[in-house]
Amino acid sequence: MKRFLISAALLAAVTATIQAHTLDGSVKDNKTGEPLIGTVIRVKELPEVTTTTGLDGTFTLHELPNKGKFTLIVSYIAYKTQEIVVDVAKKDKLDIPMTEDQKELGEVVVTGHREYRSDRSAVETVKAAGNVLNVISQQSIQLSPDVNVASVLQRVSGVTMERDASGEASYAILRGMDKRYNYTLVNGVKIPSPDDKNRYIPLNIFPSDLMDRLVVSKSLTADMEGDAAGGVVDMVMKDAPSRFQLQANAAIGASDYFWKDGRDYLTSNRSDYTHKSPYEAFGSEYKASMSDFKNGPMQVKSHSAPSPNFIGGISIGNRFWKDRLGVIVAGSIQNTFRGTERTYNSVKMASGEQAMYISKLQHRYYSIHDLNTGVHAKLDLTLPGHKLEWYNMYVHTNSKGIRYSNGIGTEYIGENSYTQDDEMRSTSTTQSIFATNLKGTHHLTKDFTIDWAGIFSQAKEEDPDRTYATLSNTVTTDNTEGDAVSGSIWSPNKTISKTYPKNAERRFQHNRDTDWAGYINLTYNTRFGNDMEAIWKTGGQYRRKERSNRYYSYIFNPADTELTLDDNSLEQFGHIEWTCRTPYSQASQLNYDSKEHIGGAYAMVTMKSQLGEVNVGFRAEHTNQIYTMLQHFRNMGQVGEQSYWDYLPSANIKWTPTQKMNVRLSYYRSINRPGFYEIVPYQIQGEEYQEKGNPNLKRA
């Protein structure tokens, strides 16, 4: 009986589906015949059956009974709503002409709000701009698979991305000019960099789903800061929507790098590491021992594959108090695992020779775990003639990584043997940027406007217990093609006859940049007739930057210099006993504090007409840089200072011969200031080569 009832129910469902009727149709203007896109068609007797017309004005109604008469309700903005009775047994297609709903009004008040998120708005912004720029809208960003700003920038013409050693895009190169020749803004305000060496900002730490649009300026006007020969990247973050809006996104995936050829994902025990150097924890007179250094970074393990990647974001916003007050809060998280490999060759010049030669071959494997989070919140208050905006942003990234390198010195390769160094580097680097700013715009008269901004921002980088350890191997080979000397590090033909620990280093470095800045601009419009106007603008800015940089390094030798390891596996790094060769840390010129004061003032005028636009301006900037090294060094001054003025003219011409064409010509003068890392007289062995600062370095 039970089977019979189930079969009967299924048969009834199938019969109903077969008997369902489909009605096609089109909706057009009864005078012009133009298709009316988005017309709503509902069935009065069946409220659940509804549809809208497509781009060609056609529609299809599904799930109608096979017999009977029904009333269609057809509605479209500015047209009269119609009710049409249709006998579905006699009609398969229906053409519906719509009549305009004309009414005579005594007064019409039109209010508008520009939607900056759309592609159309981006095109209009580029078209109307007085200087050369590109804009990517939020609509394009949402449709793309890009998860951070660096990936989005790759889609802009004239922009290429510089990738870090692990292969990820990080810095923008605008118009072919190096990353140091551009700067980054958030909502039109410059922010500091967490980088320990330079002013430029790694753009891969900013989640793309927090952005409203991305603006890339390829020429400067006088009201823009002058240290950008290449251009400016402005990240305009999400604004409060015109009505309640809740958006969320989530994605999961995995890197196929670790699935190919059986590659392993490498990790170290970063939960057990030394948070502070002994120098900072116990003072400059403290003699460090091995008990002060935890062994977690040395405990390297391999896994067949990492956990899946996860990316998610959410934003919520609304307007209150008769749309005067807007609020939006958004957050993002990106938890990703990635890997890559690359070859790096060191070069030298032989004594008395003019040619370089490769002195060392290295094949490097990277396993990286990135955790990026971002939060932003914005409030805006709009009153007649006035607008206040308070914006807050915090982005944070933690990158844990293992770099495993096999290196071969070409100078000491024997006929059947050579030395191979296996180096392990374990890192856990944290970067963060916090910015808060208050902006005001005041239309005091119809033609006179004042806008101002006050900003506090801070960028930090912490890189504690960066660990390097090297094993040295004596390798024998049958010298056949395809062995390590020929380029294949993992050749099955080689035999490791001896492995012993060589040396180790542990570095502790961190830096902090703190900025206070203020801006003010005054704008006055003058009209000449009906088709020409002049926009006069003047203003100034002041920024105070404070930077602290700390760097401590400890060198280690194996406790047993005659120790020979059983093999060169990854686990061997955690079993070696070391002794500290530099228990008081190495004195470094990279322990310094610095200050920078930048003031600027400008004046410019923009002439607009139907033929185009001319912008002419002049900017003056004063720079004062001071650094103080915390330690004394022979033949070196402990304090250094630079102070100078720069005068920067600019001109932008836009000719509009037709409504669909702009011809642009730009001229501007800019500067490039050295970073503190470059003018402090330090000298260290960097990742790839020896680095040295130059206190006499001038701006360009």
Regions found by a protein language model. Name each.
Residues 47-58:
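Short, acidic Ser/Thr/Gly-rich low-complexity loop/linker segments typical of extracellular
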Residues 62, 150-190, 231-234:
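Extracytoplasmic beta-strand/coil segments of soluble accessory domains associated
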Residues 296-404, 431-436, 649-651:
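Transmembrane beta-barrel wall of Gram-negative outer-membrane proteins
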Residues 96, 193, 205-249:
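A beta-strand signature from Gram-negative outer-membrane beta-barrel systems
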Residues 28-32, 39-44, 73-79, 89-142, ...:
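Short, acidic, small-residue-rich periplasmic hinge/interaction motif at the N-terminus
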Residues 62, 161, 189-218, 264-268:
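Short acidic/polar hinge/loop motifs at secondary-structure boundaries
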Residues 430-439, 443-447, 455-457, 509-521, ...:
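Structural signature of Gram-negative outer-membrane beta-barrels, strongest in the C-terminal barrel
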